[in-house]
Amino acid sequence: MKNQIITFLAIALSTTCFGQTDTIFSNSEKIVCSVKEITSDAVKYSFPDEDLINSIYKNVIQKIVFKNGRVQTFAEATSFKKINGVDDFENVTITQVESEIKGLFKIGDVSSKAKGTTTLSNQERVKERAYRKLKIVAAMMGANIIYLTNQRTEGNKMGGYYQSGSSAETNLSGVAYTNQLPNFNDFKLLIGEKRNFSTTEQAKMWSSASEMTKTVFQKSFIINSITNENGIIMINGDLQEESRYKNFRVVSFDKESFSVYYEDKSTSYNVKIKM
């Protein structure tokens, strides 16, 4: 009877303590805290028994469960679409609003170029091709949003007796981000001690190409080491017949396979590897 009373009191105490805190659920962690203020782009909070005020951007918050049981979700985080593979490139968002990428994880720089074939080329279609290419490269990198930093578009120029004409051209550049990185510990737990794998598919995008190419790609892939570089999973490994490449970034994984990204000068690669 005495043990039952002690157990009951322990449960009641823990429940009371939990009820005195708020919980922020971000894309990467659960934060037990006391929410102090919700601003236009961030949530300010402090940890239990601390006065220091911390901030987290709404872009990375899934929801807040307040101590009174109320749940608040944020449209900023739910608006991002998941990239499961290179074919999900249409899920990539392009923005020129800097506040929309606050708190997100930077993946890398991206750029694309599209040019018409003749001086009669449709300028809007050329621009659409450039945006499509930019999204494809971002998806290959595992990003789901691009902050566009530069856009240069030139229309068709008809030639003359002393001057040759030129077709419409669009050049884009920006920075690729994601709202959720693959979890390092989950990836290591999934592959365990296994180090020898086989690839199944390769996606390739040349800077001068208008479309991504996907081919059956059956090579051996050996993992030498796995490191966590500011949340990004990096593999030092050996890809059969590709000895120039040693560093690969894990962009996605599930129970069946994982995908890595690497680049060579102006060519981007995404390789799918069987678990």
Spans of features found by a protein language model:
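Short secondary-structure boundary motifs at beta->alpha junctions and helix caps
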Residues: 111-128, 189-209, 213-215, 227-235
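Surface-exposed short loop/turn segments
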Residues: 150-191, 201-219, 236-275
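Bacterial Sec-dependent N-terminal signal peptides
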Residues: 1-23
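A short, hydrophobic beta-strand-centered structural micro-motif
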Residues: 133-154
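Short, flexible N-terminal segments of the mature chain
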Residues: 38-50, 207-232
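Compositionally biased alpha-helical segments
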Residues: 20-121, 125-140, 169, 232, ...
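Extracytoplasmic low-complexity/disordered linkers and repeat tracts associated with LysM-containing
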Residues: 83-86, 95, 103, 184-191, ...
